[in-house]
């Protein structure tokens, strides 16, 4: 799982992409993917 910038908790199991606001993204374009 990834922990996006500004987030205290890791993303959900299948939501490991980070969006432009640091939110977890499950589908669609991803700005970054962090381990």
Curated annotation (Swiss-Prot):
Its predominant location is secreted
Q: List the coiled-coil residues.
A: none
Which keywords does the record carry?
Disulfide bond, Ion channel impairing toxin, Knottin, Neurotoxin, Secreted, Toxin, Voltage-gated sodium channel impairing toxin
GO annotations of cellular component type: extracellular region
Q: In which tissues is it expressed?
A: Expressed by the venom gland.
Q: Where does this one sit in the cell?
A: Secreted
* Nucleotide-binding found in the keyword field: no
Asked if the Swiss-Prot or TrEMBL record annotates the protein with the keyword Secreted, the reply is yes
**What are the disulfide bonds?**
4-18, 11-24, 17-32, 26-30
Q: Which GO terms describe its molecular function?
A: sodium channel regulator activity; toxin activity
Q: Superkingdom of the source?
A: Eukaryota
Q: Which family does it belong to?
A: Belongs to the neurotoxin 03 (Tx2) family. 06 subfamily.
Functional note:
Blocks voltage-gated sodium channels (Nav).
Free-text comment about domains: The presence of a 'disulfide through disulfide knot' structurally defines this protein as a knottin.
What is the protein name for this chain? U5-ctenitoxin-Co1a
Its ancestry begins with: Eukaryota, Metazoa, Ecdysozoa, Arthropoda, Chelicerata
């Amino acid at each position: 799982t990834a922990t996006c910038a500004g987030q205290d908790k890791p993303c959900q199991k299948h939501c490991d992409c980070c969006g432009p606001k640091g939110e977890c993204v499950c589908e669609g374009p991803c700005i970054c993917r962090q381990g």
